């Protein structure tokens, strides 16, 4: 159930679902697994807010275990495409594809709440349902290309080498807010709506 907010206006009461009300303040919630429907909703909101006023920041709150690489990269590409700065604020966790999205916020405007976590790892994949050796080889090659593309983005976002990201992402690599700040994925830790 989505909460409803009631506001008093000069014309009387007006009710909004909570997400529409947050959108009025240029806040987008990216929560739950990254998948096509969620990505399309986030992209539409980014495009709407950028068209409305591209001189004001957009606030993207992130709490996701990750998910679809293609859906996540569509969000990242849109964040880079629009003119408005996108502040990212990680609450809860940014894991897997979530780290790619959260770390792609505007440099200097990537934040994290003190008890949130970051996790990087190599992408997971399957054979796409095919069981023939050639299908498996094609899927493996695609997975390696995808891994390199994600490592390149993460390296750029953190100011690390691709080699370092490759090594750290070999297995699940969890980081606290302080560790994420030191690593370079965020710019500041936010506490009580103030920077730490």
UniProtKB/Swiss-Prot annotation:
It is found in: Cytoplasm. One of its GO terms (molecular function) is ATPase binding. It comes from the Bacteria. Keywords: Cytoplasm, Hydrolase, Protease, Serine protease. GO terms for cellular component: cytoplasm; endopeptidase Clp complex. Its EC number is 3.4.21.92. Transmembrane segments: none annotated. Belongs to the peptidase S14 family. This is ATP-dependent Clp protease proteolytic subunit.
